[in-house]
From Swiss-Prot:
GO terms for biological process: cell division; cell wall organization; peptidoglycan biosynthetic process; regulation of cell shape. Pathway: Cell wall biogenesis; peptidoglycan biosynthesis. Its EC number is 1.3.1.98. Cell wall formation. It comes from Clostridium botulinum (strain Langeland / NCTC 10281 / Type F). This is UDP-N-acetylenolpyruvoylglucosamine reductase.
Length: 306
C-alpha cells in the first residue's frame, strides 16, 4: 500500500494538482527505460516549491529522491518508497557576459546551445552528455578531456533542512565523479559557468566533431545510462571488460554493448534486475581475471521486487 497518499493534497498545494503523480512507473523517467513505481512523483516549477517540498518531506520523515533527466539512474524493479522530486520544469538559462546561469533541471545540451549562440566556448565537451546540469555538477561529469570542474564558477544548493546557500568552485571540491554535493547530500538548484569568448564556427565545429565521435563509438541507439562503470585507476573499464571476453554478454534483455564494452544497454525488454545481475557478473569476472574492482558510475536507487 502507498503509505504517502495522505500527503497528496499537501504536495498539490505546493506544486499544483497537475504536477503530482501517484504510483508513477519510473521506467518513464529514466534513460534505461526500466524501474518500478514511485509512490509519488512531483515536478516543482520554482525553486521555492523545491524548498517547500523538501521541508514537507523532512517534517514528516518522508524519504525523497531528486532526479533530473534520469540519464545516470537505475531504479530497481520494486520502485521507490517515498517521493521523487523531478527537476524537469526547472530549466531556465540566462547569459550574462561570459557567464551562463542555469537552473538545475536544464539539459546540458540546451546550455551548450545557449553558450554557442553567445559565442562562448568551454562547454563543448558536455554537449552530447544527456543529463541535466544538476546531476552533471553533482558527479562532476566529463568527456573528451573536459569536465564540469573546468568551467564551473559556483552553485546554489539546498541542504536537507531547507537552507539555501552558494558554494564557490573550491567549496564544491570537485574530483573524478565526485563532489562536496555528494558528500554532504546537498541538492543543486542553480549553476553558474564562467566561459571564454570564442568564434561561433570554432565552437560549432568542435561540438559537431565530438558528437560524430560519440555516434561512431557509443551505442546511442539503445537505452542505457551512459558509461556504466567509473574508470579504475590505471585502467580503462571498457578495455578490462573486453579483455575479459564479455563484449556482447547478455542476461535477459540487458547486454554488454558490442559497440562499446563500457556500456550496459537495454537491448529490449530488460528489467532492472537483468541490468543489476549483468553489472554484478561483469564486476565478478573482471575481479577474477585482473583483480580490479569496478565501481558503478550509474546511481542505483529503489527497492527490490518482493
Amino acid at each position: 500500500m502507498n503509505q504517502y497518499k495522505n500527503f497528496i493534497m499537501q504536495f498539490e498545494d505546493i506544486v499544483g494538482n497537475n504536477n503530482v503523480l501517484i504510483d508513477e512507473p519510473m521506467k518513464k523517467h529514466t534513460s534505461f527505460k526500466v524501474g518500478g513505481p514511485a509512490d509519488l512523483l512531483i515536478t516543482p516549477t520554482t525553486l521555492e516549491q523545491v524548498k517547500d517540498s523538501i521541508i514537507l518531506c523532512r517534517n514528516n520523515s518522508i524519504p525523497y529522491y531528486i532526479i533530473g533527466n534520469g540519464s545516470n539512474l537505475l531504479v530497481r524493479d520494486g520502485g521507490i518508497r517515498g517521493v521523487v522530486i523531478k527537476f524537469l520544469k526547472l530549466g531556465d538559462i540566462k547569459v550574462e557576459g561570459d557567464r551562463v546561469i542555469a537552473q538545475s533541471g536544464a539539459p546540458l545540451t540546451n546550455i551548450c546551445n545557449e553558450a554557442l549562440k553567445s559565442n562562448l566556448g568551454g562547454l563543448e565537451f558536455a554537449c552530447g552528455i544527456p543529463g541535466s546540469v544538476g546531476g552533471a555538477v553533482t558527479m562532476n561529469a566529463g568527456a573528451y578531456n573536459g569536465e564540469i570542474s573546468q568551467v564551473i564558477e559556483s552553485a546554489k544548493v539546498i541542504d536537507k533542512d531547507g537552507n539555501v546557500f552558494l558554494l564557490n568552485k573550491e567549496q564544491l571540491d570537485l574530483g573524478y565523479r565526485m563532489s562536496a554535493i555528494q558528500k554532504y547530500h546537498y541538492i543543486v538548484l542553480e549553476v553558474t559557468f564562467k566561459l571564454h569568448n570564442s568564434e561561433y564556427d570554432t565552437i560549432k565545429n568542435r561540438i559537431m566533431d565530438l558528437n560524430r565521435r560519440r555516434t561512431e563509438k557509443q551505442p546511442l541507439e539503445y537505452p542505457s545510462a551512459g558509461s556504466t562503470f567509473k574508470r579504475p585507476e590505471g585502467h580503462f573499464a571498457a578495455k578490462l571488460i573486453e579483455d575479459t571476453g564479455l563484449k556482447g554478454e547478455s542476461i535477459g534483455g540487458a547486454q554488454v554493448s558490442e559497440k562499446h564494452s563500457g556500456f550496459i544497454i537495454n537491448k529490449g525488454g530488460a528489467t532492472a534486475g537483468d541490468i543489476l545481475n549483468l553489472i554484478e557478473f561483469v564486476q565478478n569476472k573482471v575481479m577474477e581475471k585482473f583483480q580490479v574492482d569496478l565501481h558503478t558510475e550509474v546511481r542505483i536507487i529503489g527497492e527490490e521486487n518482493n
